[in-house]
UniProtKB/Swiss-Prot annotation:
It is found in: Cytoplasm, Cytoskeleton, Cilium axoneme. Disulfide bonds: none annotated. TPR repeats lie at residues 13-46, 48-80, 81-114, 275-311, 320-353, 360-393, 397-430, 437-470. GO terms for cellular component: 9+0 motile cilium; 9+2 motile cilium; axoneme; cytoplasm; extracellular region; outer dynein arm docking complex. Keywords: Cell projection, Ciliopathy, Cytoplasm, Cytoskeleton, Kartagener syndrome, Primary ciliary dyskinesia, Repeat, TPR repeat. The gene is ODAD4. It is linked to Ciliary dyskinesia, primary, 35: A form of primary ciliary dyskinesia, a disorder characterized by abnormalities of motile cilia. Respiratory infections leading to chronic inflammation and bronchiectasis are recurrent, due to defects in the respiratory cilia. Some patients exhibit randomization of left-right body asymmetry and situs inversus. Primary ciliary dyskinesia associated with situs inversus is referred to as Kartagener syndrome. CILD35 inheritance is autosomal recessive. Residues 527-544, 595-650, 658-672 have a biased composition (Basic and acidic residues). The lineage of its organism: Eukaryota, Metazoa, Chordata, Craniata, Vertebrata. This is Outer dynein arm-docking complex subunit 4. Residues 545-555 have a biased composition (Acidic residues). It comes from the Eukaryota. Residues 527-672 are annotated as: Disordered. Expressed in the nasal mucosa (at protein level).
Length: 672
């Protein structure tokens, strides 16, 4: 380092300070130290500049000069925090951890900054690593300790770690590469991977032609190699003081003992690991990281499958739970086939080991997969199997709602309404307003499909009230729109109802008119049947009068003729017995004169038909002309009935009359 006294300084103190800080940040610690020295030449004793140059010396490994500048910065102001911190850092690097801890505490009391707090922590750790913590030391009362004399204690107390000046500046009488003589085994343990670099640099020192070369800055290759070796030696010495080899061996033994103790407590540790893993899997899934949740679940499942039943007594239940977690993550990723397989494995394990809760969980998840892919009937079958396993009212509420929703998708509105009402009832028992809202909407939608618009409006209004309670604006808008549609449906139904009623009234009027016509028709037919009877009665009466007149005339003639007195008496007797004789001989006369009787009977029938057919035919013609367009078949039947009745009546009456006339004529002939 050049002497500023021999040179003429051409800049100012702030310029040299700024230059030194820039070079320090660039890693040019030697040049930065030179700039700070120039600044101190212009303004001697500046404490900030002394601290800055102390940092440069510390980075260069010149610990004594670093400590000297740090102490010089505290001469004018012992409470200067930057100086205290720099002195503590230098003492810590030198391996004097106890004094470094003292200055860290002193600075922390003056200004509780993060640098002092971190310094206290690392100094305490270094002390514990060097001498061990009280928990790792076991005092044993064995043997005779009288050989430990006061002198030996004083000698041991005077043995302090010396500064590493001899490492940085080796003596002239010995080679440079022998400046750091340490145990190779110790150095290998301390340096670790850097030990290979140290061996390489030492091999380069053996090449005499190489070490004689010079660099552009005037430095020799030998100086560069020695700088690297000294750096490694310095840090290995620091690491040995920070954590000596015996401390490393002690820690290794402590780790082995700890592992043995942990191995004995493995069941509890395993349970903690499992619970923590399941919480992480669930947290990843709920936070939206389905891929991370799936990877974590598969990793834990692979590890659990390697364990035996002794380590994890409920291994089967745990495996089923992990399959369920994997399936849920696969659902979120859209891997429905894989999710279905995972949940079916969970169901198989639950059935095999009789785990009701796991079975309920698996059926729930399988139903969700079926519903996601549109297989609503399979989802219904799966969820209906889960109904007996549902324990809480809230679980039943959700289950009934999902089943009803599937029935609604299948256009089975009655079933959807039934399950919706069950869900509504369970939600009211639970007091869950959110599920009351969902159930009311489901019931209303089913009633709309059933065209029960009034009930649908009532349920939509209930759902709207609950949506306002939970401040669900989207649900409110959807329900209002559905209410409008339901009200329009009511109007349409009312219009249809009025039309049907009018049509019904019209049809009833026509039916009553038709009945009146039928009654009128029946009256006409009765009149048709009654007219032949009246004609027959009138004809019988006229015949009786005629016979009476004839008898009176004959009786008068008999009285006028005295010669026929005897005949008149006999004729009177004959008349008195005429009815009995005619009645008694009617059978014999009919038998004897069959031919004559049949001819007379047929003649009488023809006469009656000609007489009685004429008015019935005219009536039939009139009625057929009036009603032929409406009821032709019924009119034909009635006309045939009307035709048959007078014919039968005529046959009966005219047969008897013909026989009576025949008998009377024969009696008169015999009497004459």
């Amino acid at each position: 380092m050049s002497d500023p006294e021999g040179e003429t300084l051409r800049s100012t103190f702030p310029s040299y300070m700024a230059e030194g800080e820039r070079l320090y940040l660039c890693g040019e610690f030697s040049k930065a130290a030179q700039s700070f020295s120039n600044a101190l030449y212009l303004q001697d004793g500046d404490k900030n500049c002394l601290v800055a140059r102390s940092k440069c010396f510390l980075k260069m490994g010149d610990l004594e000069r670093s400590l000297k500048d740090a102490e010089a910065s505290l001469q004018s102001d012992p409470a200067f925090c930057k100086g205290i911190l720099q002195k503590a850092e230098t003492l810590y690097t030198m391996g004097d951890f106890e004094f470094a801890l003292v200055f860290y505490h002193r600075g922390y009391k003056l200004r509780p900054d993060r640098e002092f707090r971190v310094g206290i922590q690392k100094a305490q750790e270094a002390i514990n690593n060097s001498v061990g913590s009280p928990s790792s030391i076991k005092l044993e009362n064995k043997g005779d300790l009288s050989f430990l004399s006061k002198q030996a204690e004083n000698i041991k107390a005077q043995q302090k770690p010396q500064p590493m000046k001899h490492l940085l500046h080796p003596t002239k009488g010995e080679p440079k590469w022998k400046a750091s003589l340490k145990s190779e085994k110790t150095v290998r343990q301390l340096l670790g991977e850097l030990y290979v670099d140290k061996e390489y640099l030492e091999k380069l020192l053996l090449d005499e032609d190489l070490i004689k070369g010079t660099m552009k800055g005037g430095l020799t290759v030998e100086d560069l190699i020695m700088t690297g070796i000294n750096y490694l030696d310095t840090h290995s010495n620091f690491w040995r003081q920070q954590k000596p080899i015996y401390a490393r061996e002690r820690d290794r033994k402590l780790m082995q003992e700890k592992w043995l103790r942990d191995h004995k407590r493995r069941p509890s540790q395993t349970a903690h690991y499992i619970l923590k893993s399941l919480e992480d899997i669930d947290m990843l899934l709920t936070s939206g990281s389905a891929e991370g949740s799936l990877q974590k679940a598969e990793k834990v499942l692979k590890k659990v499958l390697e364990w035996n039943k002794e380590e994890v007594p409920n291994k089967d239940e745990l495996v089923g739970n992990l399959y369920s977690c994997i399936g849920n993550a696969q659902i979120e990723l859209g891997q429905m086939e894989a999710a279905l397989q995972s949940h079916r494995k969970d169901l198989e394990i639950a059935k095999e080991y009789d785990l009701p809760d796991a079975k309920s969980r698996a059926l729930d998840n399988i139903g969700r997969v079926f519903a996601r892919v549109g297989k609503f009937q399979q989802a219904i079958d799966t969820w209906e199997e889960k109904i007996p396993l549902a324990k809480t009212t809230l679980e039943k509420t959700w289950l009934f709602h999902e089943i009803g929703r599937c029935y609604l998708e299948l256009d089975q509105a009655w079933q959807a309404q039934n399950y919706g009402e069950k869900s509504q009832q369970c939600a009211e028992e639970e007091g869950d307003i959110e599920w009351q809202l969902n159930a009311s909407v489901l019931v209303a939608q089913a009633q709309v499909k059933l065209r029960d618009f009034e009930s649908a409006v009532n349920n939509f209004e209930k759902a709207l009230e609950r949506a306002k309670l939970v401040h669900n604006n989207e649900a409110q808008q959807a329900i209002i729109s559905a209410l409008d549609d339901a009200n329009k449906g009511i109007i349409r139904e009312l219009r249809k109802t009025n039309y049907v009623e009018n049509l019904k009234e019209k049809s009833e009027g026509e039916a009553s008119l038709y009945e009146d016509r039928i009654i009128t028709r029946e009256k006409d037919m009765r009149r048709v049947r009654d007219e032949p009877e009246k004609v027959v009665k009138q004809w019988d009466h006229s015949e009786d009068e005629k016979e009476t007149d004839e008898d009176d005339e004959a009786f008068g003639e008999a009285l006028q003729s005295p010669a026929s007195g005897k005949q008149s008496v006999e004729a009177g007797k004959a008349r008195s017995d005429l009815g009995a004789v005619a009645k008694g001989l009617s059978g014999e006369l009919g038998t004897r004169s069959g031919e004559t009787g049949r001819k007379l009977l047929e003649a009488g029938r023809r006469e009656s038909r000609e007489i009685y057919r004429r008015p019935s035919g005219e009536l039939e013609q009139r009625l057929s002309g009036e009603f032929s367009r409406q009821e032709p078949e019924e009119l034909k039947k009635l006309s045939e009935v009307g035709r048959r009745e007078p014919e039968e009546l005529g046959k009966t009456q005219f047969g008897e009359i013909g026989e009576t006339k025949k008998t009377g004529n024969e009696m008169e002939k015999e009497y004459e």
